[in-house]
Each structure stands twice: as structure tokens, then as C-alpha cells.
Amino acid sequence: MNGFMIPLALSILAHVLADFVFQTDNTAKEKSEQQAKGFLKHWIVVFLTLVVLMMPFGLMDVLLYCVVLSLFHILLDVFKSSIESKRGPATRFSMFIIDQLLHLMLIVFLVPISSFTIASSFSAFIVWIDFHTGLNLAVLPVSKMLSVLIVYLYVLFAGAVFIRKLFDLIYKNQPDYLERIVGNSSSLDNVRTGKAIGIFERLLVLTLYLTGNVASITIVIAAKSLARFKNFDNKDFAEYYLIGTLASVMIAIIGGMILEVL
């Protein structure tokens, strides 16, 4: 199984990039509305991301694998969308988690039954780098490096989706909860920037956890709280902020714990 660790990691990396980094809000909206063009655009992104990341193994060797995996990826998305369209926030929250598990299980199933051969051009490139720079890329812990990258991307970007769906679940009886909490459109624009703030927050918390500076995490939380201090008079906002911050920190710490055992 060790020989499959790199293609396995590259496949998971392609999935994370295609689902959470390269997928636009418009494409996600089209998929949620079960529009064919949304699924088609997402399939193209998934397929091209897979092809690019699998290039070290040679295009012809992995082309069938990329086609099969990307098609099954879209079928899972169609299945998820068809269920979510008939249900509420609780189903969408659980289906998000189930969908990610199914995608990972699909990759784990397909990789061992596929053939991966290092392309001669890629091997020549490694030799060229070694000869001209003295860097022996062959001894790099590639699998570990890919694992770190995957967990970081999941924590940063999938974490944002998880938190949004968590809020939708908590405030399921208040469909306009954002407007009610922030009070006006200008504040609503500020709430949208919370996604970017959350990404940086999880980046810092995860890095601090992995470097053993757990106590410094409180400084990150304190700095974020100071920036929003004047909004805490609004009880609804204070609860919203607390839930989001705790969920964000929890996701980052869980990511760090996963990396510790990998």
C-alpha cells in the first residue's frame, strides 16, 4: 500500500482544491438548484485538477483514472443535491459530512485498483534538479508534506463551509438570521468578510498548535474579540460570534491533532 500513498494523497488534494478552493459560489448555487451547467462546470474543474496533479505519473497512465474518479465525484454531488433539495438545514449539515466521507472512501477504493507509473519525463526532471541545484528531491517526505497541505486546506476552506452550515442548522427557524443579527446592510457586508477572517484565524491557530505554542492561541482570540468589542452589546451578535469562534478554533485544533498522528 505504501506505493499508493502519493497518488492517494494527490487525489485527495485534487478533491479538496476542486471542492473548496476552485469552486465558485455561483457554481455551488447552480449545483444546489440542480442545474446541469453547475455540475458540468464542477466536473471540468475536478477533472483538470486531477490531471494536473497526476502528471508525474504520465497522462496516458492515469487518464482513465481521472475520468472515472471525476465522474463518480459528480455523481455523488448529484446524489447529495437531490437529497438536500427536499430537506432542511439539518439534512444539509449532515449531508455535507457524509458527502466528504463518501468522496474520501471513493478515492481510497479506486487508488489501489489503479495503475500508477512514474513518467520518464518527470524522472528526468528530478535528475535535472538534483544535478543543477544539489537538491535531492527523492529523499523529501512527499507523503507527509502532502498530508500537511491537505489538512491545512480542509481546515481553512472546508472549515468555512462547515461553520456556515452549522449556523444554518442552529438558526434553522430564523432564515434571515444574518440580517437580524447584524441589523443593517453595511454590517452584513462586514459579516461576509468574516469568512476571510476565519480562514486567517484557523491558519494561525493550527500553526500555533503544531508548533507547540498553544497558549498563544488565546492572543489570537483576544485580538479578534477586541476588533468586534463594540458589537458585543448586541446579545444576538455576541452569541453568533462566540459560536463561530469556538467552532473555528475547534476545527483548527482537530486538524492539528490529525496531523500529529499521521
Residue spans for each PLM region:
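Cytosolic juxtamembrane amphipathic/interface segments immediately preceding
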Residues: S186-T193
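Alpha-helical multi-pass transmembrane bundles of energy-transducing inner-membrane proteins
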Residues: T91, M95-D99
